């Protein structure tokens, strides 16, 4: 009996089907890390905005490797991560069908960024959202009911999460509505978690209080949208021979005569990109402060590069601008386009690999222009090389005349 002498596995994974547009623009956390009561209280996720990429030079600390104590160049991604504001507390109880929401307590004051997310058109609306919740904090009976809800959470709940939102006013984006998400609190007892959340209502939480230097995290987001694509681009099927009738970038056989329908496993043209994806094990190379603070004005320097510069490249990141708030630098690339909100989450697994525990020693961060082949790291370096330009001479002559 004859048979083919070669193997031809299917092209593309069925694990990501259906390949359709994501329902949400921001990455959704579908699982939080396992709670450990022995650890101190901490949040497990944060929302940041993708700014762009650059590259760094670091010294490898890996005994036994060929590159040990040598310099390597690696690509990094920069996320702008202004502090998030906690505006609510949610308690969950365990049921046979999984965790169920038990009680929710909202803060008294919510910003327009946060309330605007609940309206399709905030400008023309009556802006009455959360008035009933605010009135509870203003009279004695309302405050008693809030305290009663918090006490019930301490007694019956097994999981405590906070409702936090981003601050869009400090970002130079056109987007005005804040991104809101529930973030699980891990560590400590349930009563301690509720007290911690109660103390931090209406307060800002910086990104360096959630993550640490050299920590391994996960990035959850929506990929770049590519639109309607053909089967070769979408599933990476093999192109047909040159003399094929009616096209080459197609699937020659889409199934048998019977059953008289095309199975879902057959590669077809359709939507590519804008899919919800989770990328695991991204190492944090640096947690930087805002360049608007005195400490953050040199957030682009290192112990080896003492130049006073920020992490922003000359001219800013393409299609994003300048990163003025706190930032997170991770190794490698990440899903999503510029300005897209990316959810950063603590790793779900116990890290055992040597790279996860390696101390990162940055020697240099590239800040040359990303709009072309940049050769200068700072504006001062460019001025020193170029000398006086024509516009400088014109400005000096006009100053003398006046």
Swiss-Prot record:
One of its GO terms (cellular component) is cytosolic large ribosomal subunit. The keyword Cell inner membrane does not apply. Keywords: Cytoplasm, Ribonucleoprotein, Ribosomal protein. Its main location: cytoplasm. Pfam families: Ribosomal_L3. SUPFAM superfamilies: Translation proteins. It is found in: Cytoplasm. It comes from the Eukaryota. The keyword Ion transport does not apply. Residues 1-35 are annotated as: Disordered. One of its GO terms (biological process) is translation. GO terms for molecular function: RNA binding; structural constituent of ribosome. InterPro entries: L3_arc_euk, Ribosomal_L3_dom_3_arc_sf, Ribosomal_uL3, Ribosomal_uL3_CS, Transl_B-barrel_sf. Belongs to the universal ribosomal protein uL3 family. The L3 protein is a component of the large subunit of cytoplasmic ribosomes. This is Large ribosomal subunit protein uL3. It comes from Toxocara canis (Canine roundworm).
């Amino acid at each position: 009996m004859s048979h083919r002498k070669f193997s031809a596995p299917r092209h593309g994974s069925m694990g990501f089907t259906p390949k359709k547009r994501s329902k949400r623009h921001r990455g959704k956390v579908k699982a939080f890390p396992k709670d450990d009561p022995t650890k101190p209280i901490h949040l497990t996720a944060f929302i940041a905005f993708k700014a762009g990429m650059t590259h760094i030079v670091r010294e490898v600390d890996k005994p036994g490797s060929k590159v040990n104590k040598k310099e390597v160049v690696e690509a990094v991604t920069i996320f702008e991560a202004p502090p998030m504001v906690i505006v609510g507390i949610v308690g969950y109880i365990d049921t046979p069908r999984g965790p169920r929401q038990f009680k929710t307590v909202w803060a008294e004051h919510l910003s327009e960024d946060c309330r605007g997310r609940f309206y399709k058109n905030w400008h023309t609306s009556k802006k009455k959202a959360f008035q009933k919740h605010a009135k509870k904090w203003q009279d004695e009976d309302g405050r008693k009911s809030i305290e009663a809800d918090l006490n019930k959470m301490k007694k019956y709940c097994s999981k405590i999460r906070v409702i936090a939102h981003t601050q869009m006013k400090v970002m130079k984006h056109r987007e005005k509505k804040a991104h809101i998400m529930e973030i699980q609190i891990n560590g400590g007892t349930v009563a301690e978690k509720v007290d911690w959340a109660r103390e931090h209502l209406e307060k800002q939480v910086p990104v360096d209080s959630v993550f640490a230097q050299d920590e391994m995290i996960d990035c959850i987001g929506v990929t770049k949208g590519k639109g309607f694509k053909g089967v070769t681009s979408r599933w990476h099927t093999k192109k047909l021979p040159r003399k094929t009738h009616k096209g080459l970038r197609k699937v020659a056989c889409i199934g048998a005569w019977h059953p008289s329908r095309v199975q879902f496993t057959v590669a077809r043209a359709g939507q590519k990109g804008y899919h919800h994806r989770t990328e695991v094990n991204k190492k944090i190379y640096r947690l930087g402060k805002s360049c608007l603070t005195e400490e953050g004005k040199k957030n682009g320097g290192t112990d080896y590069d003492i130049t006073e510069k920020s992490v922003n490249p000359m001219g800013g990141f393409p299609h994003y601008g300048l990163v003025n708030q706190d930032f997170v630098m991770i190794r490698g690339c990440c899903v999503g386009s510029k300005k897209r909100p990316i959810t950063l989450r603590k790793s779900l697994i116990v890290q055992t690999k040597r790279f996860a525990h390696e101390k990162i020693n940055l020697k240099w961060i590239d800040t040359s222009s990303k709009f072309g082949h940049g050769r200068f790291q700072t504006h001062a370096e460019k001025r020193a090389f170029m000398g006086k330009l024509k516009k400088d001479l014109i400005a000096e002559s006009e100053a003398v005349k006046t």
